């Protein structure tokens, strides 16, 4: 026990001496004696600590109070500059009271008193208080002399008390013990601590030295003693996780930490241990006539950072804290600029360029989910969210937030405290490289691998029997494996490299997962109101262009296995209650269902909607072109090829639907649709006349809204949802056309798919509804208002819209009373006409709507269909929202908006965490 106490006092005295033990000015004989004491202590081990109960803590308070009263003597004339012992000890007292208040009951207090770190801390605090009292007792009048050795020892004790206060606040934040959750700044150093010490908060120096020696070899006992005096900031023969974190930040990087420490702390003449701000100014005062003289020390107010004092050209003495770079890099840069030339006034300035090694940048891989999320906000993951101009290239430690170097430098130069996002203390910075998400490579491989590996396969048996599809998937899997094993890609140990690999070890998880970026509610709300791919600003310049998806050939389209029957000449009359809406078509625009589309006409399709930059359409000549997304009807089947979800049916559930667009149907299928091939039913048919002026009716139930950035300024066709009849004559009207999408000759109209959809009703042109007109001008007399437009709407039909409903009635129609097909009537005369008919009187539950909208004409026309029914107010609003969806203005300047929001966040007043005694 005596030997342990003697060793402790010897170590404390060596730490409080002017230079490091083992340095140039140390006495070799004294070093050998200290080495002998250190060997004895290693053999015996540190003494066991008594339980830190309430009585022991109160005893510590009394000792601290005595030290404060001794330091309040006016003869001392202590300067109120860090470290100011008259502030440090009262703050320590207040924090200990806070800790005891959190452990007030007996059970918690017993747990606190047995806490390993707390016992060692209280014991060390008692020893340091007794040592300060002994200084006053032994120094007597010399304590009042500012240049005496006793006064110098008191200043060093003040530094130790300052380190102990910072440590207890870090281990017991808010009075609660968090030592087992303390985050070490450097990832490699944190891995070392967890590997050897687990969740321990503090370990004896002997154990720490042995474990460190396994990773970084310690050459001699003198080097071990010097290393201990540098790491052990509280001088208690223990190394805490807090002290280890400070040491690794000071002498980074971890891979060469002992070499850096030897160059900077042992052999460098400019290093000063346990020196204060005032002492640096006093030491450099004698070199005021030698500009370029400098010394450096540990910052006592910002532990883990360096403070460099130097003499300027005009003889002033300044002190600075270098940011965003290691100390040796700051000294090299300062030497080149002429600031740091003479360490401690000496002419020899060590060359530190040997410490400069190319530090490998951590690669942060942008995942598909992050890519889609930031695209919805009109941004990219790699873009700095403060300036919205530069890419992120630096990571703040330990919180892990990313930004660009210029924003971080500006923030620190403006006296910003902590991280600009979370206000967490900035303990270090690491350069990083953000690898953007490339839809060409990653998503396609992942989609094929997921489609083969996931147990929830939902492919058609016909598709699985095709060799070409299976071979393409296997080739994509091999390519993905080669890319993951390639040295070009970022290493698996880099942060946020969330690849689809085996889960990382639990020890690496805190450093692999970066915290989320603070949400931008304004951008998220805008992103919900529109699709990222439909907006012209959905893909910024810094994001990978979606057009590149077409560079690589897609797998061959599935062959025609279930071909629907050929269409007859004319559509048979079907009761209107079981009929869906019809559109007008031209033969040169409609691709034949029996015609196979060439391989080049296949185009990728985004999961979240059509992207004008990533989809193609088949024009009148049949050639694929970029532009408005088409329905991609191939062989009577809808194209499901996607670069982001292969042939995976279950991926449809992951799409994000806008709250303003509740009418949207993805790929022509509702959310609960489970089939992929239309049922074999006898569909209504059409007769296509490319030259005839009178367009005929085509059955189409693509009543969904398609997103697009282009609008065709041409005349469109008038949809009709009723069969022809000979009861009313033909009328010709003149209506105003509205620009709207027309894909592959098919006019798109709005519809609902909430399980039960109301029959499409007519809406006046002035309400912004989608009106498709023929390419031939149609003239009508003015329509008069109908008294039946205020009638309640008719019964709705249960139907599920789908792209496969083209020329195919809904499967549910067979369960109702459908009239058998009649003989097709003779073709109508070759002239432009729009027909209508009267509703059957048998359907009393369905009121007639707007039959009087088209006036009788003298020219009779057999079999005229009813016009579409007028929409109700609720449907008018839905369609208006859907139409405005394609015409959303571009997002306002993201840079200004984000900068303003961030600025408003950054200007929060800093809280003063220092508690003063009352």
UniProtKB/Swiss-Prot annotation:
Q: Where is this region: EF-hand-like?
A: 179-251
- Low complexity bias locations: 1-18
Binding positions (4-O-phospho-L-tyrosine): 297
Cite the binding residues for Ca(2+): 232, 234, 236, 238, 243
Biased composition, Pro residues: where in the chain? 554-576, 821-830
Write out the GO biological process terms: cell surface receptor signaling pathway; immune system process; negative regulation of epidermal growth factor receptor signaling pathway; protein ubiquitination; regulation of platelet-derived growth factor receptor-alpha signaling pathway; signal transduction
Region of interest called Linker, as start-end residue ranges on this chain: 355-383
Q: Name one Pfam family in it.
A: Cbl_N3
Alphabetized, the UniProt keywords read: Calcium, Cytoplasm, Immunity, Metal-binding, Repeat, Transferase, Ubl conjugation pathway, Zinc, Zinc-finger
Q: Residue ranges of the Cbl-PTB domain?
A: 46-354
Q: In which pathway does it act?
A: Protein modification; protein ubiquitination
Enzyme class comes to transferase
* Bias (Polar residues): 483-497, 898-918
**Classification via InterPro entries:** Adaptor_Cbl, Adaptor_Cbl_EF_hand-like, Adaptor_Cbl_N_dom_sf, Adaptor_Cbl_N_hlx, Adaptor_Cbl_SH2-like, Cbl_PTB, EF-hand-dom_pair, SH2_dom_sf
Q: Which reaction does it catalyse?
A: S-ubiquitinyl-[E2 ubiquitin-conjugating enzyme]-L-cysteine + [acceptor protein]-L-lysine = [E2 ubiquitin-conjugating enzyme]-L-cysteine + N(6)-ubiquitinyl-[acceptor protein]-L-lysine
- UniProt-listed CDD domains: RING-HC_Cbl, SH2_Cbl-b_TKB
What GO molecular-function term can you cite, just one? SH3 domain binding
| GO CC terms of this entry | cytoplasm; membrane raft; plasma membrane
Which PANTHER family does this one have? CBL, E3 UBIQUITIN-PROTEIN LIGASE CBL-B
Miscellaneous notes: This protein has one functional calcium-binding site.
Role played: E3 ubiquitin-protein ligase which accepts ubiquitin from specific E2 ubiquitin-conjugating enzymes, and transfers it to substrates, generally promoting their degradation by the proteasome.
> What does the record's free text say on domains?
The N-terminus is composed of the phosphotyrosine binding (PTB) domain, a short linker region and the RING-type zinc finger. The PTB domain, which is also called TKB (tyrosine kinase binding) domain, is composed of three different subdomains: a four-helix bundle (4H), a calcium-binding EF hand and a divergent SH2 domain.
The subunit structure is: Interacts with several SH3 domain-containing proteins and with poly-ubiquitinated proteins.
Its recorded name reads E3 ubiquitin-protein ligase CBL-B-A
Species per Swiss-Prot/TrEMBL record: Xenopus laevis
């Amino acid at each position: 026990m005596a030997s342990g106490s003697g060793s402790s006092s010897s170590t404390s005295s060596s730490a409080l001496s002017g230079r490091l033990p083992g340095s140039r000015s140390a006495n070799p004989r004294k070093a050998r004696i200290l080495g002998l004491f250190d060997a004895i202590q290693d053999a015996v081990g540190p003494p066991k600590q008594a339980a830190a109960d309430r009585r022991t803590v109160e005893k510590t308070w009394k000792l601290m109070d005595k030290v404060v009263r001794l330091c309040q003597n006016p003869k001392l004339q202590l300067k109120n500059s860090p470290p100011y012992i008259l502030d440090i000890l009262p703050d320590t007292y207040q924090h200990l009271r806070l800790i005891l208040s959190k452990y007030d009951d007996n059970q918690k207090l017993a747990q606190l008193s047995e806490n390993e770190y707390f016992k060692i801390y209280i014991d060390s605090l008692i020893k340091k208080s007794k040592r300060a009292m002994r200084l006053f007792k032994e120094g007597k009048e010399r304590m009042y002399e500012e240049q005496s050795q006793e006064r110098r020892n008191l200043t060093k004790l003040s530094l130790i008390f300052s380190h102990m206060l910072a440590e207890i606040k870090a281990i017991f934040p808010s009075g609660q013990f968090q030592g087992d959750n303390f985050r070490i700044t450097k990832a490699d150093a944190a891995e070392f601590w967890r590997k050897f010490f687990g969740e321990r908060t503090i370990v004896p120096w002997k154990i720490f030295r042995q474990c460190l020696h396994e990773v970084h070899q310690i050459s001699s006992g003198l080097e071990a003693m010097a290393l201990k005096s540098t790491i052990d900031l509280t001088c208690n023969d223990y190394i805490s996780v807090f002290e280890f974190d400070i040491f690794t930040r000071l002498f980074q990087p971890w891979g060469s930490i002992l070499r850096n420490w030897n160059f900077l702390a042992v052999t460098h003449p400019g290093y000063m241990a346990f020196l204060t701000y005032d002492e640096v100014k006093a030491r450099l005062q004698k070199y005021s006539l030698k500009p370029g003289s400098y010394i450096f020390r540990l910052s006592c107010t910002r532990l883990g950072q360096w403070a460099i004092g130097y003499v300027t050209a005009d003889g002033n003495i300044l002190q600075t804290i270098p940011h965003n770079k290691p100390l040796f890099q700051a000294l090299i840069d300062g030497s080149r600029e002429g600031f740091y030339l003479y360490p401690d006034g000496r002419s020899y300035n060590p060359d530190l360029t040997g410490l400069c090694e190319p530090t490998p940048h951590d690669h942060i891989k942008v995942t598909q989910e992050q890519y889609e999320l930031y695209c919805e906000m009109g941004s990219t993951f790699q873009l700095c969210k403060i300036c919205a101009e530069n890419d992120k290239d630096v990571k703040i430690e330990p919180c892990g937030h990313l930004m660009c170097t210029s924003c971080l430098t500006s923030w620190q130069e403006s006296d910003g405290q902590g991280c600009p996002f979370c206000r967490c203390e900035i303990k270090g910075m690491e350069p990083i490289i953000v690898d953007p998400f490339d839809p060409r490579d990653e998503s396609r491989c992942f989609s094929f691998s997921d489609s083969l590996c996931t147990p929830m396969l939902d492919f058609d048996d016909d598709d699985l029997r095709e060799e070409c599809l299976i071979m393409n998937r296997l080739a994509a899997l091999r390519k993905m494996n080669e890319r993951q094993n390639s040295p070009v890609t970022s290493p698996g140990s880099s942060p946020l490299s969330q690849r689809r690999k085996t889960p990382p070890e639990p020890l690496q998880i805190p450093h692999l997962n970066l915290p989320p970026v603070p949400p931008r509610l304004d951008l998220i709300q805008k992103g919900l109101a529109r699709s990222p791919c439909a907006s012209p600003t959905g893909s910024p310049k810094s994001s990978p262009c979606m057009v590149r998806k077409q560079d690589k050939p897609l797998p061959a389209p599935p062959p025609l296995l279930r071909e629907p029957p050929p269409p007859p000449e004319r559509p048979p009359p079907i009761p209107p209650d079981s009929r869906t809406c019809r559109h007008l078509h031209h033969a040169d625009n409609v691709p034949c269902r029996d015609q196979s589309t060439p391989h080049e006409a296949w185009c990728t399709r985004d999961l979240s909607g059509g992207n004008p930059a990533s989809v193609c359409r088949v024009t009148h000549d049949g050639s694929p072109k970029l532009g408005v997304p088409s329905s991609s009807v191939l062989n009577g089947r809808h194209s499901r090829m996607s670069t982001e979800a292969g042939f995976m049916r279950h991926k449809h559930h992951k799409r994000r639907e806008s709250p303003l667009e509740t009418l949207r149907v993805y790929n022509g299928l509702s959310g609960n649709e489970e089939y992929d091939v239309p049922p074999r039913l006898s569909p209504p048919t059409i007769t296509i006349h490319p030259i005839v002026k009178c367009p005929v009716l085509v059955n189409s139930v693509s009543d969904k809204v398609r997103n697009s950035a282009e609008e065709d300024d041409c005349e469109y066709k008038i949809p009709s949802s009723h069969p022809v009849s000979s009861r009313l004559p033909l009328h010709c009207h003149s209506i105003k056309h509205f620009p709207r999408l027309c894909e592959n000759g098919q006019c798109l109209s709005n519809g609902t798919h909430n399980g039960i959809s109301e029959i499409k009703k007519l809406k006046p042109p002035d309400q912004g509804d989608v009106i498709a007109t023929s390419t031939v001008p149609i003239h009508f007399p003015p329509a008069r208002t109908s008294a039946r437009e205020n009638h309640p709407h008719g019964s709705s039909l249960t139907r599920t819209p789908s792209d496969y409903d083209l020329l195919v009635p809904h499967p549910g129609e067979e369960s109702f009373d459908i009239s058998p097909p009649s003989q097709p009537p003779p073709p109508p005369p070759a002239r432009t006409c729009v027909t209508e008919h009267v509703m059957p009187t048998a359907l009393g539950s369905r009121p007639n709507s707007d039959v009087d909208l088209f006036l009788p004409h003298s020219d009779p026309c057999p079999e005229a269909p009813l016009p579409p029914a007028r929409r109700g107010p609720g449907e008018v609003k839905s369609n208006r929202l859907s139409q405005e969806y394609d015409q959303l203005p571009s997002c306002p300047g993201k840079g200004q908006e984000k900068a303003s929001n961030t600025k408003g966040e950054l200007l929060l007043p800093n809280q003063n965490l220092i508690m003063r005694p009352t």
